[in-house]
Amino acid sequence: MATPTIKLNSGFDMPLVGFGLWKVNNDTCADQVYEAIKAGYRLFDGACDYGNEVEAGQGVARAIKEGIVKREELFIVSKLWNSFHDGDKVEPICRKQLADWGVDYFDLYIVHFPVALKYVDPAVRYPPGWSAKGDGSIEFSNASIQETWTAMETLVDKKLARSIGVSNFSAQLLMDLLRYARVRPATLQIEHHPYLTQPRLVEYAQKEGIAVTAYSSFGPLSFLELQVPNATNISPLFEHDVVKSVADKHGKTPAQVLLRWSTQRGIAVIPKSNNPTRLSQNLEVTGWDLEQSEIDAISALDIGLRFNDPIGYGMYVPIF
């Protein structure tokens, strides 16, 4: 069964479920992407900062070469890192990332964070991370979001990106962006799970015709190995009584319940797994529904707990 899609304001269809490439190891990335394509995944969510786009592209190339999928059947996402927000740096880095993936265009290219950092030449260090000097210090660029977005729009004009979007933006930043955007953002990617539901932001984006994609759908799980304090001090969502009881009732896994909690509300998800069974399970987002009372009960777990915060990684960039 084909994965359901969301119609973007750019006119393109985006799969409701994709495969996220954050923290996918370089030595296994190509195989994981290849296996995910075989399992039915068509959207792959990458980024400069993940440092594995070359390997992800190798997995894509293998699947295409073997006739498993055509390029036009895939939806490849990448992101503009903070160090490349200056207007004259956007297109060159996008072209580098396209070359890394081995493709001619991105289906979606996203501004990763609403913060411009000092430029780091890819020949010096790539990906550059948060610190221009690599010592944990933060140096900002003077590029405005408007300058960056104007350069992003040029990517659409030149057919390097079919759609462009933003990530980790607040409602206020979206409001400002929409005042001057010639090409409206097609998507907003945010941290979204029962511990951080951000209902007003989601509602505003959807009202403006901007599709919402949730990352870290399983809450603290992805952050435990990073030893983020918030993640180690909270009950895992997979073990929460509310989530477990709903899963038991429907004969589903807690992971499936958490993903359906998002997709049933029109929010796309980008989980990852190297387990073949879980790969397939994570695609099962149709054919069953949560009751509204169950959605409400899961949503009621919201405590405004954010895990993906630069400050949590020791980088003083107070964007949240």
UniProtKB/Swiss-Prot annotation:
Keywords: Carbohydrate metabolism, NAD, NADP, Oxidoreductase, Xylose metabolism
Residues involved in NAD(+) binding: 167-168, 216-225, 272-282
CDD domains: AKR_AKR2D1
GO terms (BP aspect): D-xylose catabolic process
Annotated Gene3D superfamilies: NADP-dependent oxidoreductase domain
Enzyme Commission code: 1.1.1.307
Pfam families listed in its UniProt record: Aldo_ket_red (PF00248)
Site description Lowers pKa of active site Tyr, residues in chain: 79
The protein's annotated pathway: Carbohydrate metabolism; D-xylose degradation
SUPFAM superfamilies: NAD(P)-linked oxidoreductase (SSF51430)
Highest taxon listed in the record's lineage: Eukaryota
Known role: Catalyzes the initial reaction in the xylose utilization pathway by reducing D-xylose into xylitol. Xylose is a major component of hemicelluloses such as xylan. Most fungi utilize D-xylose via three enzymatic reactions, xylose reductase (XR), xylitol dehydrogenase (XDH), and xylulokinase, to form xylulose 5-phosphate, which enters pentose phosphate pathway.
PANTHER family cross-referenced by the UniProt entry: ALDO/KETO REDUCTASE (PTHR11732)
Protein name in the entry: Probable NAD(P)H-dependent D-xylose reductase xyl1
Native source organism of the sequence: Aspergillus terreus (strain NIH 2624 / FGSC A1156)
